Swiss-Prot record:
This is Small ribosomal subunit protein uS15. It comes from Vibrio atlanticus (strain LGP32) (Vibrio splendidus (strain Mel32)). Belongs to the universal ribosomal protein uS15 family. NCBIfam families: S15_bact. One of its GO terms (molecular function) is rRNA binding. One of its GO terms (cellular component) is cytosolic small ribosomal subunit.
Length: 89
């Protein structure tokens, strides 16, 4: 259920702060969001896949923690990221 290398590279290129940036919160949140969206499609077909659902909840929690960190460090970057990803907050 993971993303392929081309998709990851495209996401990293779009959200990176500088060349070769893979560790910034924006990149990490964007990658987690893509994985979460991919898993949501999986659960429409496989409603009783509880093992993968646990992984999904772990990813959502990790994304929430990264977003809280970014909100505390730089509010404008946080708001820009939320708008770009189309998250509800």
């Amino acid at each position: 259920m993971s993303l392929n290398a081309e998709t990851k590279a495209a996401i990293v290129a779009e959200y990176a702060q500088s060349e070769g940036d893979t560790g910034s919160p924006e990149v990490q949140v964007a990658l987690l969001t893509a994985s979460i969206n991919h898993l949501q499609g999986h659960f429409k077909a496989h409603k009783h896949d509880h093992h993968s659902r646990r992984g999904l909840l772990r990813m959502v929690s990790s994304r929430r923690k990264l977003l809280d960190y970014l909100k505390g460090k730089n509010l404008t970057r946080y708001q820009d990221l939320i708008k770009r990803l189309g998250l509800r907050r």
